[in-house]
Amino acid sequence: MRGDMILFIRILSLTGVILGALGGLYLAYDLLGGKNGPLRMITKSVSYGVMFGSAYGLTLGIWFALAGFLASGPALGLEIGRRNVGVAHPFVGAIGFGFLRAFSFGVAGWLSRDPQFGINFGILSAVGFVASYVILGPPPAAINSGRPHIDKTVLKRAVFRGASIGLAAVLSGAIHMEPDALFYGVKVGLVTGISSGLLVAVAPSVEAWVDNLPDRRLGGYGAILLLIGSLCQTFQYVLPLLGIRE
């Protein structure tokens, strides 16, 4: 079996473990404080992660899909959560959120392209993400409106995010003398910028939807996550039965 396929199976199994754990948390909703517990925040983060993962996966491949699901989505959920409780956006927070996303992008670049590109892309993306957080701050106040909202602030965030990450991808490819550096960088910039803008625009609807979910519905989501997690973990055991071995 090819090395990248083996790595994919291992990551799929790890994802299954994470989904199974999340499902267990949902089923223990009452034990974790009910409406005052962390599960609604987790639901929002997972929702954003699925949307980021889908957008990145369809255009940039499986590794960026995982970066979107495991890092970009939760980061946006935490940003909005901090905004909703009145927490400021200090420089330390900017570094934390920026480095989280940059690390995931660097790993995705490493696995989808090569190690040198991934290292360069991770470092340069960190500069771009932190600059975005420091200059533009947290998501706009309209995030609490309960309906999709696009204004100059949302568009500015999308353009700045897309330009900075696209430039990071172009420079990373150019440093490594890759012939398609410009094309790939423009592609990455467009995808990240458009995805960021759209997700921030629809975030008010996601926030309102999750806040109004019935408790029983959350239990149903927990059961679904447990099932999906079990299927992901089962995949590694099915392959040997089909005669496919490492």
Named regions from a protein language model:
Residues S125, G173-P204:
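Short alpha-helical packing/oligomerization segments
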Residues R2-L19:
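Hydrophobic transmembrane alpha-helical segments in integral membrane proteins
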Residues S13-G16, P38-V50:
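Loop-to-helix transition at the N-terminal end of transmembrane alpha-helices
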Residues R10-T15, A65-A67, F91, D114-I123, ...:
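Hydrophobic alpha-helical transmembrane segments
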Residues L231-E246:
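Juxtamembrane boundary at the C-terminal end of a transmembrane helix
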